[in-house]
Amino acid sequence: MTKSEMAAALNSKSAWLPGKRVKLDFGSEGVVMLDGAASQVTEEDGAADTTIKVSWQDWQDMSEGRLDGMTAFMQGKLKVEGDMSNAMQLQGVLAKL
């Protein structure tokens, strides 16, 4: 799945936290913004309540079950900036993929 395909899938399933802006920052691969304030998922950068930084490859590994999110966090492969509770709530939202 490409980043654009992922953003479209999340958008079609309303996969955001109401009233919250959460940015998935894939470094040089770009970003996906789960914008609960605007009720949409985009590939546009901007200010966020929570930013999750992870490489695109590690993200793919997590989404395909080859890498556990908590393990990635403990190994420093996944970093969270801002409101940590939003990151915790995303587990259920991202299960919609």
Where are these regions (language model features)?
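Feature captures hydrophobic
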Residues: 1-97
